[in-house]
Amino acid sequence: MKFINKYKSVNFNLRKKGHKIKYIILHYTAIKSDYKAIQHLIYKKNKVSSHFLINKKGKIFSLVDLNKRAWHAGQSFWKGDRDINSSSIG
């Protein structure tokens, strides 16, 4: 599997202490081009990010390192977990 590391988001922080990755969250974006979708996910003022963006052809863009907490799940709750961003890849 080849990852494209050309773009990096500044929208991340550290995972909360004790949180391990338990979930993979898949999102869909209606933004038409890869470039515009990536720009949306890395632009600081948008305050949103994802670990990866996978385009229609299967290219994988790595935007946030896996050991960091991307901002993709917002204020969320699942099975007693109140910080999905800290316990997921999204």
Descriptions of predicted regions:
Residues K2-K17, K22-G90:
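Active-site-adjacent loop/helix surface patches within enzyme catalytic domains
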